[in-house]
């Protein structure tokens, strides 16, 4: 079965797409996946600005919510059609799994109460003529879970059989980690900001969308009073399962912390010093959790891996831990989440639960998503009674 997975993450800079051909080995214990195509399609500048302008704490009307749902749906449909027609995809996909764009993740007093992803899947189904799995988080929320993270499904299967305890870290807008190994159930949660605050600072200064190659951080110095104030964030001390996003770490977050702390923390800083401080914040927060988790290996992915200052600071802060890119396990650091959603779509199509309760806190595993039919009658594979226990990926 060929599945096209799609997601736009908390950096809301574009759509990650992966086309994966899955084959189940005889006996059903091992699933093999060939990543035939993987790419990132940037959002048009105007659409990205509208997404950013609608994120918390902004107040937007329902007309704009409706328009964004349609326009994001068109953007996802365009990206899917482009990937389906790529020369390295020999046949059209049988299924699409689209995460869409998270606009709001409703968490109150540590409990997830709702979640909203825009990008109507009907536009994708109409464009490609195949079924589309979407709205994948809410089923876990209704079961008492956080609705996040969902990537532990991929992490658990991909690292099945690996020796020792391994932490799998994604450095997107938000940093999230999965811990697998030693025969225990996976543990996974959102750690805190990865690129979100850095990107917001760079964008606010009109210097682009992100700190390219960590150049701004490298040119600055860490401002200790501000860093100390930022490290007092209560979220970091909360025990998992937990999830967060730009509902907390929004573009105004740093200014609120500075005003609240006063004194030296509120001093005017150069952009370079601010970005250096925020980069150190991400490295410090992630590293303290990695040390606490007592792992031998850290597998990294996401846009933050392309920032040598961030990755260097993180690596230096976890001596004795082997830091390796996810490429070593057959999945690109840039497209791991798209591959994960292709896998999630395969699970849903076969009637298999894809949530990991030990990661999300749900009362049990659930089959995720809603299915929008394609051009003809909805025909899904015969449901499987047992899920595969391992995944091997190649490209």
Curated annotation (Swiss-Prot):
Binding positions for ATP per the UniProt entry: 9-16
Catalysed reaction(s) here are: 1,6-anhydro-N-acetyl-beta-muramate + ATP + H2O = N-acetyl-D-muramate 6-phosphate + ADP + H(+)
Q: Which domain of life is it from?
A: Bacteria
Matches recorded under SUPFAM superfamilies: Actin-like ATPase domain
UniProt-listed Pfam families: AnmK
Associated pathway = Amino-sugar metabolism; 1,6-anhydro-N-acetylmuramate degradation; Cell wall biogenesis; peptidoglycan recycling
The UniProt keywords, alphabetically, are:
ATP-binding, Carbohydrate metabolism, Kinase, Nucleotide-binding, Transferase
InterPro entries cross-referenced by the UniProt entry: Anhydro_N_Ac-Mur_kinase (IPR005338), ATPase_NBD (IPR043129)
Record EC number: 2.7.1.170
- Annotated family: Belongs to the anhydro-N-acetylmuramic acid kinase family.
One of its GO biological process terms is:
1,6-anhydro-N-acetyl-beta-muramic acid catabolic process
Purpose of the protein: Catalyzes the specific phosphorylation of 1,6-anhydro-N-acetylmuramic acid (anhMurNAc) with the simultaneous cleavage of the 1,6-anhydro ring, generating MurNAc-6-P. Is required for the utilization of anhMurNAc either imported from the medium or derived from its own cell wall murein, and thus plays a role in cell wall recycling.
Q: Which organism is it from?
A: Beutenbergia cavernae (strain ATCC BAA-8 / DSM 12333 / CCUG 43141 / JCM 11478 / NBRC 16432 / NCIMB 13614 / HKI 0122)
Keyword Transferase carried by entry: yes
Q: What is this protein called?
A: Anhydro-N-acetylmuramic acid kinase
> Which leading EC class covers this enzyme?
transferase
Q: What GO terms are given for molecular function? A: ATP binding; kinase activity; phosphotransferase activity, alcohol group as acceptor
């Amino acid at each position: 079965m060929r599945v096209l997975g799609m997601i736009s993450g908390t950096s809301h800079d574009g759509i990650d797409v992966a086309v994966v051909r899955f084959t189940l080995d005889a006996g059903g214990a091992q699933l093999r996946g060939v990543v035939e195509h993987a790419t990132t399609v940037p959002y048009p500048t105007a659409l990205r600005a509208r997404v950013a302008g609608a994120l918390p704490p902004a107040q937007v009307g329902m007309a704009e919510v409706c328009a964004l749902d349609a326009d994001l749906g068109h953007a996802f449909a365009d990206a899917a059609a482009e990937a389906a027609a790529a020369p390295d995809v020999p046949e059209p996909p049988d299924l699409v799994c689209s995460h869409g764009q998270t606009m709001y993740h409703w968490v109150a007093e540590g409990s997830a109460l709702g979640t909203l992803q825009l990008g109507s899947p009907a536009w994708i189904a109409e464009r490609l003529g195949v079924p589309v799995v979407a709205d994948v988080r809410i089923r876990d929320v209704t079961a008492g879970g956080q609705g996040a993270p969902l990537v532990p499904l991929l992490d658990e299967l991909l690292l099945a059989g690996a020796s020792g305890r391994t932490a799998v870290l994604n450095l997107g807008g938000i940093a999230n980690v999965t811990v697998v190994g030693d025969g225990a159930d996976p543990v996974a949660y959102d750690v805190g900001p990865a690129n979100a605050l850095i990107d917001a600072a760079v964008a606010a200064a009109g210097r682009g969308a992100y700190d390219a190659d960590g150049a701004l951080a490298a040119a600055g110095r860490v401002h200790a009073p501000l860093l100390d104030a930022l490290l007092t964030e209560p979220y970091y001390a909360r025990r998992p399962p937990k999830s967060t996003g730009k509902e907390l770490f929004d573009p105004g977050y740093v200014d609120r912390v500075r005003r609240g702390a006063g004194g030296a923390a509120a001093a005017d800083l150069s952009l370079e010093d601010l970005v250096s401080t925020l980069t150190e914040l991400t490295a410090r927060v992630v590293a303290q959790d990695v040390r606490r988790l007592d792992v031998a290996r850290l597998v990294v992915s996401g846009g933050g891996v392309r920032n040598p200052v961030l990755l260097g600071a993180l690596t230096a802060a976890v001596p004795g831990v082997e830091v390796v890119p996810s490429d070593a396990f057959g999945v690109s650091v840039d497209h791991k989440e798209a591959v994960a959603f292709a896998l999630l779509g395969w699970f849903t199509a076969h009637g298999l639960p894809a949530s990991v309760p030990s990661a999300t806190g749900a009362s049990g595993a659930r089959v995720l998503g809603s299915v929008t039919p394609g051009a003809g009658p909805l025909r899904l594979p015969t449901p499987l009674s047992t899920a595969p226990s391992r995944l091997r990926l190649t490209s």
